[in-house]
């Protein structure tokens, strides 16, 4: 973990209430897909944790949904604006633990970290396939970006306005060895009830400090209490008490 002063290179809407934020600066602390940044927003006491969608040697891309005052303020920031962030937080996905074919299942904004994971899987010679769930067509994002990587991608919407009608569990692809998922807890529970394949689950939680000191994001696991910000956000599916 390091503290970095990032410069906004891009901050633009990509779907209903969802923005893509590209930051330029030091990314050396980012070592795995599924990690996150904790952004300091002026006027707000707590930092805002946002999962990493993609990164390279000079920039990091985040996707976020406007859900309150902090993210509303963030959505108004323009290129050139400086943001203070704690970078490279959390325990990310273990690419080596993924099978030859890995199902990436994302729900809403939980799709974000799976894009970076897809790129890492491809770089490791593995085959990711994606099933992404949204409420309606206006909410869909990154379908084309996944497909541009050559990833077989299926979209499910609750109202049937785009792709398969229903949820990610209604659109599961048949052939995969492992599963990696991120999204709302009901989606994750339903997914793990539908398939018994080994996998990794990225949990969403409210956080205080973002680096394990405050214990505010603790969950109960089969191995006792664990911090989503420190031991997570990615856990083995077998660790989670559903």
What annotation goes with each model-predicted range?
Residues 233-242:
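Short microdomains enriched in Cys/His and/or Lys/Arg
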Residues 69-206:
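FNR/FR-type flavoprotein reductase catalytic core
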Residues 2-81:
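Ferredoxin-reductase
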Residues 45-52, 90-97, 229:
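Short, Lys/Arg- and Gly-enriched loop/turn segments at beta-strand edges
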Residues 113, 204-233:
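Local cysteine-cluster metal-coordination motifs and their immediate loop/turn environment
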Residues 10, 54, 155, 201-203, ...:
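Structural signal for conserved beta-strand scaffold positions within catalytic alpha/beta enzyme cores
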């Amino acid at each position: 973990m390091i503290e970095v002063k990032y410069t906004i290179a891009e901050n633009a809407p990509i779907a209903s209430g969802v923005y893509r934020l590209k930051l330029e600066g030091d990314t050396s602390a980012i070592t795995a897909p599924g990690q996150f940044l904790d952004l300091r927003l002026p006027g707000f006491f707590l930092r805002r944790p946002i999962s990493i969608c993609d990164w390279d040697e000079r920039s990091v891309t985040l996707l976020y949904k406007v859900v309150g005052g902090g993210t509303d303020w963030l959505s108004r920031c323009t290129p050139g604006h400086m943001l203070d962030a704690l970078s490279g937080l959390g325990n990310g996905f273990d690419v080596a633990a993924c099978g030859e074919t890995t199902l990436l299942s994302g729900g809403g904004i939980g799709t974000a970290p799976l894009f970076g994971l897809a790129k890492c899987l491809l770089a490791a010679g593995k085959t990711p396939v994606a099933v992404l769930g949204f409420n309606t067509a206006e909410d869909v994002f990154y379908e084309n970006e996944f497909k541009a990587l050559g990833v077989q991608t299926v979209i499910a919407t609750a109202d049937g306005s785009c792709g398969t009608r229903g949820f990610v569990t209604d659109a599961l692809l048949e052939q995969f060895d492992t599963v990696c998922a991120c999204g709302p807890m009901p989606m994750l529970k339903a997914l793990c009830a539908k398939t018994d394949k080994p996998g990794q689950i990225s949990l969403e939680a409210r956080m205080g400090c973002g680096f394990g000191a405050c214990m505010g994001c603790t969950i109960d696991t089969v191995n006792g209490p664990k911090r989503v910000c420190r031991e997570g956000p990615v856990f083995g599916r077998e660790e989670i008490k559903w």
